Amino acid sequence: MKNNILMSVLLTVSLSAALPLSAASHVDVVKMRTENRVNPLGIGTSTPRFSWQITSDRKGVVQTSYQILVASSREKLDRNEADLWDSGERNSDEQLWIPYQGKALLSGAQAYWKVRITTNKGKSEWTEPQLFTIGLLGETKWSGTWIGLEDLQPGEQKGMHTRLAARYIRKDFAAKGKVKRAVAYVAGLGVYEFYVNGQRMGGSQALQPVPTDYRKTIYYNTFDVTSLLTEKNAIAIKLGNGRMFPMRLEKAYKTPFFGYPKCRINVKVEYENGKTETWATNNTWKLSFDGPIRSNNEYDGEEYDARREQALKGWTQAGFDDSQWQKAERCAIPDGTLMAQPMTGMVEKKFGHPVSLKHRHDTLIVDFGQNMAGWIGFQVRGRQGDTIRVKYAEKLQADGSLYLDNFRNALSEDIYICNGRENGKSWRPAFSYHGFRYAAITGMKNARKEDFTAYTVSDEMATIGHIETSDTILNKVLKNAWWGIYGNYKGMPVDCPQRNERQPWLGDRTVGSLGESFVFDNERLYSKWMHDICDAQRSDGNIPDVAPAFWNYYTDDVTWPAALPFTCDMLYHQFGNKQPIIDSYPSIRKWINHILAEYTDKNGIITKDKYGDWCVPPEKLELIHSQDPKRKTDGKLIATAYMIRCLQLAEQFANLQGLKEEAKAWADRRNGMIDAFNRQFLTNKAGTSRRPGHVLYPDSIYYGNNTSTANLLALSFGIAPQ
């Protein structure tokens, strides 16, 4: 798609990471991607897609051809020995989502690729090699079992404020020779930290894996652990709740219960002598729930008792005495399909120290000067048994205390119980994040600004758009928008990071995803979310208002589920990725047909809409044209307008796949609904002239009760007659 290639070029403004080409060409190939990721490990397809961008200090540079080489080793690729695939020189300006078409890539395969392009200004050199590996493609490629504990333990509870201690699981393994390559595949529900010989894997990654409906999809992560293995090895994992063991369980009809934390791990080891083996989870692994993390709850926070650290000292290293630990239970196999995580997921980034500390009675109020989503780390000093509490908030009351009404019943508090030996040790939670600018700290004496550090925790993605104006207020609005969007990327787009909700509402992103895409490279997040929405669809075609369906809100709405076709369209036009359209089209078709069959009246109008013009902003007097004092837009008008747009998108999606008959059927249905919409909602007052040069009387043509919403939808969705 030429428009997407042009966008790729325009968005690439930095040459700092460029790969050098011939001096005469003045062209650089940058941002090489496999499945839109940099050197990804364990991708979930045997036909990956390659992308790159070009930059130049000249104008009018256009790619005219490319050649891709893929090899099974770096050495072969350096010799231009493409034993997996040589695309040959292809006359094309395409730079996005070029599909691999070489030899079959099997589970665990490792490959290297590079590209050379020709432009109207000359030919480039070969780029530097890029790496990708294939994950475990299917259940039959996995060994071992799911392990964990399948019940509550002493001190744990369901109900309004669920409590569950972290699960600590480990096993030692002896290598049977010199290791050539070792790869770990880790599925840990709900969230986990994974260790090999004492080394925490994943770097800055946090709260892995990204959340899904575990009844449908379970993501695993892949780690290359070759350099960490020795003769004796320890494989260990710490499991938190995430969304697996939900934060609230007092309403069974509303919140699905997925089960208790569990894991499945495969470490595939390849030796220099050609032999292989798999270290896999089973009931010979050992488990403890008596570690320091006594409770972890996304709404309520994390409780950490450092007095329990000593008993687990060295638990992630080989040779640890786990004889007093219990055997891990073999758990029921989750219903969800194991799949490679298609995105990096959340990462922790250091924000900085507070801008102010203020004492209020026995409480210290810290202000970081910026609302964000993440957690606070601090330097621990105290006597054994001292309790440090960190209570989070987004704003303060007039008296300087925390304002907490907007948190509702989310406790949002991290608790640390000292062992008396910390002496300034740094601590921060592992399995709970918060929305905050402020925090109230109790239990710390002689605290300083440098004792506290805020960290953001959100999905890893680049900022690709920046706007700065001469207006300071507008600049502040834009800055706040950046922080608001970024703080709500949590492996899925959520509505808020602070209160007892944090749900992936579809309606928020029906239009929001498009606006966000001008600021963030959010393709991986939203492609993953399309899969979530399809997972959440019921057999009758109903798509819920929240997906993954962590709340059972199947209201049969139109405007909220419209996020599926709307966002698929965004991914195609903004990032050139048509795969979400292809994958989601059956669900879109099923949903549209369901709504049309169940909620179309005899006049051709959609009768069902739950939310209407949700949270409509106040209007200035000069913008009010409606004579209706309530100015509430008819839900039928909104639902029908959105369905008309969805039918238009369905037609486009069908044409994109060559489904001409389906495309025509969608177009016919859309045209009929447009006629019905205009008959039902369009007012054309007598005396109105449609002749050129004649005056059009104010408010003589309008939709519904003449609200801004009613008129704008008709214009935006191409419903208003010419």
Predicted features, each with a name:
Residues N552-H573:
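Thiamine diphosphate
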Residues S25-Q110, K114-R499, G507-D508, R524-S527, ...:
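Extracellular/oxidizing-compartment recognition motifs
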Residues M1-V27:
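Bacterial Sec-dependent N-terminal signal peptides
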Residues T567-M570, C646-L649, F653, F717:
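Core register positions within helices of long alpha-helical scaffolds
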Residues G190-V191, T281-D290, Y438, R448-N480, ...:
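Active-site acid/base region of carbohydrate-active enzymes
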Residues A71-S72, T133-E139, S204, T640-Q657, ...:
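Conserved, charged catalytic cores of large soluble enzymes
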Residues C568, T640, L647, A710-N711:
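TPR repeat positional signature
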